[in-house]
């Protein structure tokens, strides 16, 4: 299932939903780290900006998983950060979710 298709099916988020989303976002974050660390990376600054933007969402999900809950406000903020990342940098819509 595609990343945003999965997110759009969630009415009331659970910690299990957050774990699934976290796994996909974390894979994207790891890919960005690899690209930034490539020798003679011409796009180093771009990859670092990508990582900083995505890190906000990742940190929110970690906090929710640690607290074993997500409030409606946290969910809306998380969705805002994820969609903002997609608009600014792209690449998330091609992620697949493993259930």
What are these regions (language model features)?
Residues 3-30:
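N-terminal acidic leader/helix
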Residues 27-93, 97:
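Acidic, low-complexity, intrinsically disordered interaction modules
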């Amino acid at each position: 299932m595609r990343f945003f298709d999965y997110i759009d099916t969630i009415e009331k988020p659970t910690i299990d939903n957050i774990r699934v989303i976290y796994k996909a976002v974390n894979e994207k974050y790891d890919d960005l780290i690899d690209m930034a660390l490539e020798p003679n990376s011409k796009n180093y600054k771009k990859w670092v900006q990508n990582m900083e933007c995505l890190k906000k969402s990742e940190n929110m999900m970690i906090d929710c998983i640690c607290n074993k809950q997500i409030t409606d406000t946290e969910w809306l903020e998380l969705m805002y950060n994820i969609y903002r990342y997609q608009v600014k940098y792209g690449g998330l819509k091609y992620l697949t979710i493993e259930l």
